[in-house]
Amino acid sequence: MSSPERDEGTPVPDSRGHCDADTVSGTPDRRPLLGEEKAVTGEGRAGIVGSPAPRDVEGLVPQIRVAAARQGESPPSVRGPAAAVFVTPKYVEKAQETRGAESQARDVKTEPGTVAAAAEKSEVATPGSEEVMEVEQKPAGEEMEMLEASGGVREAPEEAGPWHLGIDLRRNPLEAIQLELDTVNAQADRAFQHLEQKFGRMRRHYLERRNYIIQNIPGFWMTAFRNHPQLSAMIRGRDAEMLRYVTSLEVKELRHPKTGCKFKFFFRRNPYFRNKLIVKEYEVRSSGRVVSLSTPIIWRRGHEPQSFIRRNQDLICSFFTWFSDHSLPESDRIAEIIKEDLWPNPLQYYLCREGIRRPRRRPIREPVEIPRPFGFQSG
């Protein structure tokens, strides 16, 4: 082609993008394709060994124009088969394919080699991507191993022995039943507390009226104590005389019945001690141990009672010793008898004067083992 032909209608990119064989072999930025090796150099593979990676066809146009401008010449035209190859749209497609292969093989670094080696890059791209995928999969495996080592991922044993299976089958129903039983017990406790508060208010009214009447009966509590088949053994010497000054007895449970109870003995003025109120309290601590506390008795001079009375080589506890000595083995038993037997109905023991018993609609209560509501253990 001549320069007038370019001016008449030949597209600029098609004419200016062509170069002759010398330009192709000497340009560092241009790598001939496999189909144009012989057409460009005529020397086979030896003439194009060491050519660097190709660039865009469009990128060659400004370089050729700049080189021609420096030399003062017009851009050279390419003739022959090479020109046909360059002009055809197939070259553009091949250039685009080469550019796509280069972008895929960009991460895989290789030294410049032969055209065959450069062509193999596009073929190696697929295995290279597989290698990259394999490398990316390794951290996932390491994470799984770390999770398994830390106990995050555990596989259930495929075959569990019948022994472990039997234990689980026996344990789970028992746990479920126990949970249901605990729920029922909690509901019962709440209902009991509600009823206790409701009927406690009703009982309080009658107890106040009963105490008011008993205060006007001289020696009521002394008679009730002496007529009780179990408490009468403790009334010794001056105990009966001191009990004559008891005006009122109150037994109160603490906030919750299982936490203990309190005994209050009210006295009128007497020649034996100065106290008008003596309190004996049993309290259940958080550890489960039951301890007893009492008010110290302020004895008048010369009226300190004997702590123990020896009879038949046995130690017998005095009633007033029960207030001060908390280590006596019978101390807890006395508290139970007063709370569970004497206090609910003292009238039945008051009416038993000197063994004379009134006819009753029910049999007389015999001395029996009274269950301990909260397990007294003095400390």
Curated annotation (Swiss-Prot):
Residues 1-21, 28-40, 97-110 have a biased composition (Basic and acidic residues). Pfam families: NAP. It comes from Mus musculus. Keywords: Isopeptide bond, Nucleus, Ubl conjugation. The keyword Ubl conjugation applies. Highly expressed in testis, ovary, liver, spleen, brain, kidney, prostate, lung, and heart. Low expression in liver. The gene is Tspyl1. Ubiquitinated by the CRL2(APPBP2) complex, which recognizes the Arg-Xaa-Xaa-Gly sequence at the C-terminus, leading to its degradation. One of its GO terms (cellular component) is nucleoplasm. Belongs to the nucleosome assembly protein (NAP) family. Residues 1-58, 97-134 are annotated as: Disordered. This is Testis-specific Y-encoded-like protein 1. There is a cross-link at residue 109 (Glycyl lysine isopeptide (Lys-Gly) (interchain with G-Cter in SUMO2)). Its main location: nucleus. One of its GO terms (biological process) is nucleosome assembly.
